[in-house]
Amino acid sequence: MKKMMIRADDLGYSEAVNYGIEKSVKCGIINNVGFMVNMEASEHGYNLIKDCDVSLGCHTNICVGKPVCDPKLIPSITSGTEFKSSKEYRSSKEDFVVLEEVILEIEAQYQKFKQITGKEPDYFEGHAIDSPNFIKGLEIVANRHNLLFSGISFDGTPVLVNNQQVYMNMGNTSSDDYNPFKTFVEMYENAKDGFN
């Protein structure tokens, strides 16, 4: 039997994204939301859904906006006062993320999540950066605080979450012809038994 969990990531990215996620949650489409705590619209987004019955995760972000900790402490992932862009990560042939630095930022975002929400995240994961050091840093911080780490998969291989194999499909949202409905249909048609 196919089981699909549809997660809306990037709560906090902007007010427009926040309103879209709020609507999808309140219409019953989404019950799993990834929260970016480092953005200007973070608290706005949280306030829109804080009373909803939703699984809220810490969606750790190192490629858009300003970091939570001092940028001078994390030069491998910042450019000036902002994070390096996702384009810089994608175009690099090597992992330039320094593990010790990214752990500082991951920890800071975890603490900011607790400050804003007053609770632990229901799960812990990262925002679409294919960096082994970023993923390792997420695992280290998750283990340090006994958090449910949901992992990241960029090649279609399943990740283990709560002893359950989960297949992730983000679709290619940067494509000029991206169609979320078509992506959803393809995702369902290609889904394997178990969680997708």
Outline where the language-model segments fall.
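Active-site beta->alpha N-cap acidic-glycine motif
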Residues: 2-65
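Short, acidic/polar
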Residues: 14-22, 102-112
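Active-site gating loops and adjacent loop-to-helix segments of metal-dependent hydrolytic enzymes
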Residues: 67-97
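Acidic (Asp/Glu)-rich catalytic clusters
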Residues: 21-27, 43-55, 72-81, 114-117, ...
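Hydrophobic faces of well-ordered beta-strands that scaffold small-molecule active sites
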Residues: 4-9, 31-35, 56-58, 122-124, ...
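Active-site mouth loops of central-metabolism enzymes
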Residues: 3-14, 91-103
